[in-house]
Amino acid sequence: MLQKKKINYPLQQIARIKTGVYCNPSNTGNAWYLQAADLQADGCLSRGLKPTLHLEGKLQDRLLKKNDVLFMAKGVNNLALAYDPKTYGALIPSTAFLIISNSNTGVLPGYIAWYINQPPAQQYLKAQAKGSSPPSITVKTLGELEIYIPDIETQKTILKVHDLRTREKQLKSDIEHLKEKILNYQLSKAIRK
């Protein structure tokens, strides 16, 4: 029986990597200027982002596109997020981010983000980070990260299981929050008697 050989590819062979852009945000606009504080520790974008940029001229070219992956290049939380225009709307990332533009149909953007967020990839990136306050990951370093690419069905299965686990954790958190509210209500009621 032949065993499949496990092949890793440098990310730069799979996708194009570019930096975010520096802009002066305003109080109004028709696009969101994504800054470091907008990415939460769980890898999700903050809720309630407000449009702070007017899309004009060269800024149009900097809009995130479907299949792009956002990567937090500066700071200690070097997380990746697959961009979905239906969920997040028009976004232009700041220089705190690297953008992984994936045009390879054999690799799902969600899989790239999931792989980057796994402990072995995170350990590699942290070991290669430049500077100390805050540390940052360069385009070159991210491009050299080797990624194992299974078949598309395996990628879909991984993402489905990951999504289910994430949902399970959220439900457990919600249940704990509700239990806390019930207990506090009952204790407050007991002392009022």
What are these regions (language model features)?
Residues 11, 98-148:
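Basic, amphipathic alpha-helical recognition segments used for DNA target recognition
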Residues 8-23, 39-66:
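Sequence-specific dsDNA recognition surfaces
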Residues 58-59, 87, 132:
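A structural connector/turn signal
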Residues 73-114:
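A short beta-sheet element
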Residues 1-29, 149-193:
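Non-catalytic DNA-recognition/assembly elements of restriction-modification systems
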Residues 68-71:
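Generic structural signal for buried aliphatic residues
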Residues 25-31, 62-64, 83-95:
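Short, surface-exposed loop/turn microsegments at beta-strand edges and helix-strand junctions
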Residues 26-42:
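Compositionally biased, charged N-terminal/linker segments
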